[in-house]
Amino acid sequence: MFLQIVTSVLATGLLYALISVLQQNRTLSASLPPGPPGHWLFGNAPPRAFPYRHFAELTETYGPVFTLRFGRRIVCVIGRYQAAVDILMKHSAETSDRPRSVAANEIMSKGHRVLMTPAGERLKKYRRALHAFLQPSSSATYKPMQYKNAKNYVLDCLHDGRHHLYHGRKYAASVVMSVAYGKTTPTSYSDPEVLQINKSLARLGAALKPGAYLVDTYPILKYCPGYASHLRRYREEELALITKQANAVRELLAKGEAPPSFTAYLIENQERLGISDDELAYLSGAIFGAGSDTTAAALGIMTMAAACYPEAQARVQAQLDEVVGRDRAPTFEDEDLLPEVTAFVLEAYRWRPVSAGGFSHRATKDVVWNGYVIPAGAEIIGNHWAISRDPEVYPNPEDFKPARWLNEHGRIRNDLKFINFGFGRRVCVGQHVADQSLFINTALVLWAFRISQDAQCPIDTYAFTDTANVHPLPFSLHFEPRVKDMEAMLGAQAE
């Protein structure tokens, strides 16, 4: 009986898909941006690994925007800067929706994960809550905490440079746990709760990979008994964890002992914000998911670039010596006088973008671009990797050149941008906290050390994880101190 039900459901779904695909092929082929040919029914085969690199190759063949088909799904991939501005920025009102994500959002997240929440009132509610705590004026209040943890990061690299990537993860986790839950002590990346959170993030990233679950192409499979039961188990495990963390803050608030945090803000304003307990837990968890993973990866990329491009590193250090000297450590107050540091960070964002493949948008209305039509309902991917390699905007894009971000007066250019934090109304709300982290860590670590590669084990700058947010695979560095009495100046704050 069960087999008959499953067979009937699949047959109905395939018949519906066949009719829909044939209809789409007749009505849309002439107007869509070009793309590689695919199977008449199933469309294009999803890339098996590193989709952003595969899509970048297709950009070279088919142009700034190309079209793929996965069953009934139409996916338009953007690989050039101006096309991204035209479609995802200027048409933000029509392209800020998210495609339906059955596996990762509906099954794994109960529809509460802000990253995948469709455009509408719920998304506005979530973003209002996030913006209230992460806007520039609020983000500035985190600088003392970020500075303390950045000094710990430098001291960790001084004492144990071999595990520099781990120290970057520890920095990121400590900052994010402080912002999200008010934790005031450094957070080890081996803490049980952090390990559980990262396990959940890895599961989410796997579910978001193109073609990972057939249910995203044929949503009717969601209703097949037993289908994707492991995803439902993942959901319950994650919800139990983030609810436990939120409840711990509730208990501290009840005692009058809770330090300021995003979770405390949500609890105190829960009724006004109109959010349920589950929504509150997911919003708090989103801070860790969005901030820890990406910041840790960006710190690894920053040190990789410093080691691989010693001349660029030396330019930053020359300005640090001129502005700061070696008798004190740089601080946030020096930022306006250190454009070389900012340029180095901006180039690291571009050179190896953390969200390399970007996250899918969905058109709610037809979007006309250069004579082509991206139809309502189509998915739109801004491929950060390909956009970052647009030779018209970033000449010699494979080279690491922080100087491209500076004008003739040595100040940061206003006419050059890289959209590394997302597009339009989907831009990352936490970008100001992230920028603060990258600036102060870059300033401190390049002030403190001359970073170089291990001659016996040169760095492969293309060796990254195949995940939604990419991380450098382990690589060796030498941290040669540039400053005497570093510990005395920074203070022995490592715990």
From Swiss-Prot:
Membrane-topology descriptor: Single-pass membrane protein
Binding residues annotated for heme, in chain numbering: C428
UniProt keyword terms in alphabetical order: Glycoprotein, Heme, Iron, Membrane, Metal-binding, Monooxygenase, Oxidoreductase, Transmembrane, Transmembrane helix
Gene Ontology cellular component annotations, sorted alphabetically: membrane
Protein EC: 1.-.-.-
Enzyme class: oxidoreductase
Transmembrane segments: 2-22
GO MF entry, a single one: heme binding
Protein family: Belongs to the cytochrome P450 family.
Protein name, UniProt field: Cytochrome P450 monooxygenase 64
Organism: Postia placenta (strain ATCC 44394 / Madison 698-R)
